[in-house]
Amino acid sequence: MALSEIDKQLLKRCLDREPRAWEDFVDRFVGLVIHVVNHTGNSRSIQISEQDREDFTAEVFLAILADEFAVLKRFRGASSISTYLTVIARRVVVRELLKRKISAM
C-alpha cells in the first residue's frame, strides 16, 4: 500500500523536528498503538491493566523516539505506516511482557 500524502508529510515533519510534529504523530497513531497493546495481551490471554496499557503505550512511543527516530528512519514504505507501526508496537509489547514475566519469577 502506498504511503498517503498525509503520512508522508507527517514523517518528514517528525524527521525534520518541526514544531508540533511529534504531537501530531502521537495524536494520529495513539489509537492504533492502544489497540495493538490490547490485542497483543488478549491474544496471549493476558489481562492488561489500565496502568500497564499506559506504560506499554509510552514504551512504544519511546522506542520510536529512540536514537533520533531510528525506527522512522528505517521505514522504507513497503507497507503503510500503520502496518509498520503495528509490527513495532507488537514487538515492544511482547518484549515488555517477557520482561515482566521474567522479573516475576
Predicted segments, located by residue:
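Residue-level preference for hydrophobic side chains embedded in well-ordered alpha helices
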Residues: F25, F29-V33, F56, V60, ...
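Short, aromatic/basic-enriched loop-to-helix "N-cap" motif that marks the start
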Residues: Q47-E54, F69-V87
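Amphipathic C-terminal alpha-helical segment
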Residues: H35, A66-D67, V94-R95
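Arg/Lys-rich amphipathic alpha helix in sigma70-family domain 2
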Residues: H39, V87-M105
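Short, charged helix-capping/linker segments at alpha-helix termini
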Residues: D16-D27, I34-E59
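Acidic, Ser/Thr- and Pro/Gly-rich low-complexity regulatory segments
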Residues: S4-Q9
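Generic structural signal for alpha-helix termini and adjacent loop/cap motifs
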Residues: R17, A66-A70, K99
